[in-house]
């Protein structure tokens, strides 16, 4: 009987220990940097959807700050409205604010994570993900200046939508948002 109680106690102890470890791991927060209306987080690539989870990431990335700034400057969008104009996704003062932080994030991101960013602007938030594969740096946008991506010209509420305008050497692909 004494041996039965000992083994029963050991079994309960092991189950409690495993449960505590699992709860501790599940509660681990993503690494987050927040400064002056700009937030960066490293997120597991599997949480970003099936289109990204299939991509072989090449992280951390060896890239200079001037290169990141050129990328940011080259990103252009167009509002899908009657008088929609091509506009930069990031204004020069925004690039000045976030260029160094994005560079450091790309240089330090773990190989199985992607970078999620959110920039608060007077016109609304610009948010999305950035990650690198073998040949490309991928910029994925959820919203630009407060306008969320809906995949069609007008949203059900009549809000104007947008599309990316690829520049020389760029291409874009619209992926359905989950």
Name what the model sees in each region.
Residues 11-20:
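Bacterial N-terminal signal peptides
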Residues 67-178:
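Mature extracellular/secreted ectodomains of secretory-pathway proteins
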Residues 55-73:
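Compositionally biased P/S/T/G-rich terminal and signal peptide-adjacent segments
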Residues 2-12:
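Bacterial N-terminal signal peptides that target proteins for export
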Residues 26-29:
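Bacterial signal peptide processing site
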Residues 31-60:
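Post-signal peptide N-terminal segment of mature Sec-exported envelope proteins
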Residues 22-24:
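C-terminal motif of bacterial Sec signal peptides marking the signal peptidase cleavage site
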């Amino acid at each position: 009987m004494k041996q039965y109680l000992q083994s029963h106690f050991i079994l309960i102890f092991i189950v409690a220990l495993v449960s505590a470890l699992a709860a501790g791991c599940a509660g681990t927060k993503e690494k987050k940097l927040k400064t002056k209306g700009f937030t960066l987080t490293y997120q597991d690539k599997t949480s970003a959807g099936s289109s990204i989870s299939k991509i072989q990431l090449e992280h951390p990335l060896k890239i200079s700050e001037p290169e990141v700034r050129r990328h940011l400057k080259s990103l252009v969008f167009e509002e899908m409205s009657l008088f929609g104009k091509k506009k930069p996704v990031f204004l020069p003062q925004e690039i000045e604010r976030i260029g160094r932080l994005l560079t450091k994030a790309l240089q330090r991101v773990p190989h199985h994570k992607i970078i999620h960013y959110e920039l608060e602007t007077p016109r609304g938030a610009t948010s999305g993900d950035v990650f690198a594969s073998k040949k490309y740096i991928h910029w994925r946008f959820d919203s630009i200046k407060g306008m969320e991506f809906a995949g069609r010209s007008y949203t059900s509420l009549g809000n104007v939508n947008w599309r990316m305008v690829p520049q020389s050497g760029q291409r874009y692909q619209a992926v359905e948002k989950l």
